[in-house]
């Protein structure tokens, strides 16, 4: 019997999840159908629950419903608890289970690039939900120190405060975007400023070996500045594929190879 999956969000037309999951299915021999679902901004829960009531096997959650999905779950993975957001749902024994595969997607993408994560010092620009979701997996993969830089320093400090007990093996630090300096192994842009006219200028006293832009498919001043410095860079398509692979594995028990889809 064909398994039914969906991705839910608002807007949703831009999602590439159906093409990815159908490509994974073709490669692995899993019989599935994967659709986009547009939910009204005030209708996430009813739309999600009706999908599972109709026999749906699993659902991905995208903007703006990840925090709502987190709040509705009966059972959460450790990484979802830390992220306080859920992008992967499934039913088991009548209970709604939730996970967050975004951070694992980023780790898989960085590993596929053969950028070493072991004992690294990482700078993340931005202190929003995207950053919260990747800290724990980065530390699990070997990051030793993570510095979170944000325009509003208090928000970065709050995030460090929230997460330090979850990752005691790593050093977390908060700084203002105005105080960017020092040497880093990897710099990750988790802000949306690279996609707008409000682009951040990276100061000369800030040095980094690799640059990762979480967004993809749009002009990025962050990537432009990495190019100017001749720093190896990548944008977020690998992370998108990586998080989708992790969700596919949770649901179907088989893990496609990331390199086959980049």
Curated annotation (Swiss-Prot):
Its BP terms in the Gene Ontology are:
amino acid biosynthetic process; aromatic amino acid family biosynthetic process; chorismate biosynthetic process; shikimate metabolic process
Keyword field: Amino-acid biosynthesis, Aromatic amino acid biosynthesis, NADP, Oxidoreductase
| InterPro entries linked | Aminoacid_DH-like_N_sf, NAD(P)-bd_dom_sf, SDH_C, Shikimate_DH, Shikimate_DH-bd_N, Shikimate_DH_fam, Shikm_DH/Glu-tRNA_Rdtase
Enzyme class (EC, first level): oxidoreductase
Catalysis: reaction(s): shikimate + NADP(+) = 3-dehydroshikimate + NADPH + H(+)
| Pfam families hit by this protein | SDH_C, Shikimate_DH, Shikimate_dh_N
Please indicate if the UniProt record lists Amino-acid biosynthesis as a keyword.
yes
Q: Which residues bind shikimate?
A: 15-17, 62, 87, 102, 216
List, in alphabetical order, the Gene Ontology terms for molecular function in this entry.
NADP binding; shikimate 3-dehydrogenase (NADP+) activity
Note the Gene3D superfamilies from the entry: Leucine Dehydrogenase, chain A, domain 1 (3.40.50.10860), NAD(P)-binding Rossmann-like Domain (3.40.50.720)
Question: Keyword Oxidoreductase: yes or no?
Answer: yes
What EC number(s) is this enzyme filed under?
1.1.1.25
Q: In which pathway does it act?
A: Metabolic intermediate biosynthesis; chorismate biosynthesis; chorismate from D-erythrose 4-phosphate and phosphoenolpyruvate: step 4/7
Q: Where does NADP(+) bind?
A: 78, 126-130, 150-155, 214, 236
Q: Where is the active site?
A: 66 (proton acceptor)
This protein's GO CC annotations: cytosol
Described by its record, this protein's role is as follows: Involved in the biosynthesis of the chorismate, which leads to the biosynthesis of aromatic amino acids. Catalyzes the reversible NADPH linked reduction of 3-dehydroshikimate (DHSA) to yield shikimate (SA).
Protein family membership: Belongs to the shikimate dehydrogenase family.
What assembly does the database describe for this protein?
Answer: Homodimer.
> What protein am I looking at?
Shikimate dehydrogenase (NADP(+))
User: Which species is this record about?
Assistant: Acinetobacter baumannii (strain AB307-0294)
